[in-house]
Amino acid sequence: RMRQVLIVFAAFLLLAVGVSFVNGPAELLARLTGWDMTLWLWVIFAYYVFATLLPIDKIIGKVYPFMGGALLFMALGVGAYLIYGDATGAIEMKELTADSLRNFHSNPDANILFPMLFVVISCGAISGFHATQSPLMARCMANEKYARPVFYGAMVSEGVVALIWATAAIAYFGGPEGLNAAADAGKTPAVMVNEICNSWLGRVGAVLAILGVVACPITSGDTAFRSMRLIVAQAFRFSQKKLVSRLVVSVPIFVVAYVCCFMDFSTIWKYVGISNQILATVTLWTAAAFLARSGKVHWIMTVPAMFLTDVCVCYLCVAPYKVGGLAMPQVVGNVAGIVAAFALLALFLYKMRRR
């Protein structure tokens, strides 16, 4: 029964991830070309359909190296300009001081630092979605010895890319206040990236950088939909050997995804964030149980599992109704999160000792 619940939950997460990584590239491509955004939605969905239906080495495996290269070029180019601009005085990077360790959100009352920070910024820290992609990536490796550089290296690289872009956005718009003003004026992340790349990297560099920005979400979306197809097919024990069978599973998924594309991005992303962290929490407790049963030190998994339990329970208590929370006072959420974390720890230790 728990397995069925996790399958449904993972399918929901993958759908939300796929949807959230359609609008951004479509909007940016529409701005660059002047074509209607709906047309680009159809183009991106067409790619997703082929990537979802065909074997992973036919499309995804062939285009990923180029997309990854563009993404790394974009990050390194922007990072290099940050260093150059700060050295020459062209830009000013905000220094980390005691005063800067606070909530800079334009609406801090509705977006409290804890637990919102650990839900909105989730992929580079610990991610349930990325865990669902591990089997796909593992099948693409010729030898198990590549697992460490591939998975650990990807985690570190993603963290570096995220830090570069966070710094770039703050520096370009004149600090957190300017970044908030740009967001309040209706500038989406895709629009901001377009502005920064065109301003800092020149025309050629901007083209490659934009390619990386478009490729980054698309490479998450295609694998999300592919994993969702496999999960749904496995849940219903529906063979996927024939193309017709794959279409039977995929078509309803894409119909629902297309409808969801017209929802507010920030709302979808918060659902992605909390779903991501709940799945990561379950995975950490599972890994802790495995280590304990194997006679190994389990605290390396137990402590992060407790922290994420606190984060998830607190978020579900204090988040607004529209993003799945109960809109309770922050103190209630903090207490509930701590109690839940230690209660699960006590249950975990009790179960492990009985074994």
Task: List the predicted regions and their residue ranges.
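Helix-loop-helix connectors at the membrane interface of multi-pass transporters/channels
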Residues: 1, 22-41, 134-159, 190-195, ...
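Helix-loop-helix module between adjacent transmembrane segments
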Residues: 1-55, 122-126, 212-221, 240-241
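Inter-helical loop and helix-membrane interface segments of multi-pass membrane transporters/permeases
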Residues: 1-3, 19-41, 88-113, 177-191, ...
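Small-residue-rich segments of transmembrane alpha-helices in multi-pass membrane proteins
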Residues: 3-5, 66-81, 155-164, 250-254, ...
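Loop-to-transmembrane helix boundary motifs in multi-pass membrane proteins
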Residues: 5, 38-43, 153-162, 170, ...
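Membrane-water interface regions at transmembrane-helix termini and the short interhelical loops
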Residues: 17-32, 45-67, 234-237, 260-268, ...
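A generic transmembrane alpha-helix motif of multi-pass inner-membrane proteins
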Residues: 61, 75-87, 91, 98-106, ...
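Extracellular/periplasmic helix-exit of transmembrane alpha-helices
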Residues: 82-96, 152-195
